[in-house]
């Protein structure tokens, strides 16, 4: 059965594309067939894909498509989604006419955030949209907030320390235990060198790989049916 994961944050969201690229690379490494859909007008995902093709670095097991309208997305899902093990969707975030159909098709929505008030509020908006769509359609799409571009300095800020109580206690959604740190390799990948999993393993790459594996393990746990509260315990 095809698993559908979307990255959504109505206020931008740090690292949506990078997060999905890393998750896709991990699933492809396992032997999965992964589709990625670029619905963001900035075309970051599609640019990475074409640049990787030009450098003969396109990863095996991954295909990337571009759809900018809800109709195009829904048609593609009906005709093609079942041919893939995972479908990962990079969204524009703010256009509800696009985001609502994406949520309606998703098993999990990930809202990446940097520790900023704007992005935390965007993640909360995304969670509320998931609840709204679930209620309207009788679905059980899950939602999680992922902290990205983390540094040692960021970890000492007041807002960083407030993220967990805000997200888990006040809002009531899931906060990933895995954090995505600010790493040069994540920037390098966007230059068309394929996925993280294709790179020669150095100490820096090994850290990023461990980080990504931990994230995907959490994703699999959520998709496997464990409640968010249970997994957070």
Where are these regions (language model features)?
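P-loop/Walker-type NTP enzyme "switch/lid" segment
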Residues: 4-14, 20-89, 93-97, 191
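Structural beta-sheet core signal
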Residues: 36, 89, 111, 145-147
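Inter-lobe coupling/hinge region of RecA-like P-loop helicase motors
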Residues: 186-213
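Charged phosphate-binding loop/patch that engages nucleotide di/tri-phosphates or the phosphate backbone
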Residues: 209-233
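Conserved C-terminal guanine-recognition region of P-loop GTPase G domains, centered on the G4
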Residues: 123-137
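Beta-strand-loop-alpha "switch" segments that mediate conformational coupling across diverse proteins
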Residues: 151, 163-196
């Amino acid at each position: 059965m095809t698993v559908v994961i979307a990255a959504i944050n109505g206020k931008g969201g740090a690292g949506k594309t990078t997060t999905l690229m890393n998750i896709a690379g991990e699933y492809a490494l396992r032997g999965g067939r992964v589709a990625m859909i670029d619905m963001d007008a900035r075309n970051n995902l599609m640019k990475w894909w074409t640049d990787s093709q030009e450098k003969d670095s396109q990863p095996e097991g991954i295909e990337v498509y571009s759809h900018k309208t809800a109709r195009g997305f829904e048609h593609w899902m009906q005709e093609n989604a079942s041919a893939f093990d995972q479908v990962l969707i990079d969204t524009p975030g703010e256009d509800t006419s696009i985001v609502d159909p994406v949520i309606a098709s998703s098993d999990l929505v990930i809202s990446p955030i940097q520790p900023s008030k704007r992005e935390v509020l965007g993640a909360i908006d995304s969670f509320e949209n998931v609840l709204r769509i679930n209620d309207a359609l009788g679905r059980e799409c899950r939602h999680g907030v992922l902290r990205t571009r983390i540094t040692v300095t960021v970890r000492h800020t007041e807002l960083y320390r407030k993220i967990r109580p805000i997200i888990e206690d006040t809002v009531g959604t899931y906060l990933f235990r895995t954090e995505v740190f600010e790493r040069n390799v994540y920037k390098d990948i966007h230059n068309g060198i394929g996925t993280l999993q294709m790179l020669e393993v150095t100490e820096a790459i090994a850290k990023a790989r461990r980080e990504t594996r931990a994230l995907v393990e959490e994703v699999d746990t959520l998709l496997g049916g464990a409640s968010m509260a249970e997994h957070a315990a």
